[in-house]
């Protein structure tokens, strides 16, 4: 049973990531003028967004690098978590890449609080949230222009499939 749950979670995550890649490839993004305000992007989700597995900030560094390689440099990754740094680096093919590590990823989180899992929806919209001089719900505090959402893996791992679509729709509609 445990192996089946892990396999299903892996397939779901792969499907979501492949779907996101296809969508990104279909969207034509024009480079933003340096004179305009940076586009605020919030990577939001569970441990996959947090970068927990390798402890290396996960997919976010590759996302930032791909934007830069496509001429999109006027963006700001926003969120309450930054893995203890305002900038981060990684080495790729002998090149040191610098990227913005800010995000709203939380290891172990489900779409909504369910069982012993904390819920992303409750955390994001918690009006008692305080981080330094930023307070209020995260959407108001950071005002992202773009949200990248990767959530639901822990719902699948815990076999909390009943209502998963409704929970996700409720989060997205907020």
List PLM regions with ranges.
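Conserved beta-strand elements of the Class I
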Residues: 40-44
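Sec-dependent signal peptide cleavage junction
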Residues: 18-36
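N-terminal secretory signal peptides that target proteins for export/translocation
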Residues: 1-3
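Nucleotide donor/acceptor-binding cores
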Residues: 37-39, 52
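Sec-dependent N-terminal signal peptides
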Residues: 6-21
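Generic structural signal for well-ordered alpha-helices
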Residues: 168-173
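Conserved SGNH/GDSL esterase-like catalytic core that processes O-acyl groups on lipids
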Residues: 49-165
């Amino acid at each position: 049973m445990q192996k089946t749950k892990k396999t299903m979670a892996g397939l779901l995550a792969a499907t979501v990531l492949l779907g996101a890649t296809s969508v990104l490839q279909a969207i034509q993004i024009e480079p933003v003028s340096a004179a305009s305000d940076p586009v605020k992007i919030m990577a939001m989700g569970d441990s996959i967004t947090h970068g927990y597995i390798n402890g290396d900030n996960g997919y976010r560094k590759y996302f930032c690098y791909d934007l830069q390689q496509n001429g999109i440099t006027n963006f700001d990754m926003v969120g309450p978590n930054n893995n203890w740094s305002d900038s981060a680096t990684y080495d790729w093919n002998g090149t040191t890449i610098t990227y913005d590590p800010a995000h709203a990823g939380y290891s172990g989180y489900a779409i909504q609080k369910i069982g012993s899992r904390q819920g992303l929806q409750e955390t994001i919209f918690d009006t008692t949230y305080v981080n330094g001089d930023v307070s209020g719900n995260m959407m108001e505090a950071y005002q992202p222009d773009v949200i990248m959402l990767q959530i639901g893996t822990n719902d699948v791992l815990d076999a909390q499939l009943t209502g998963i679509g409704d929970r996700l729709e409720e989060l997205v509609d907020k």
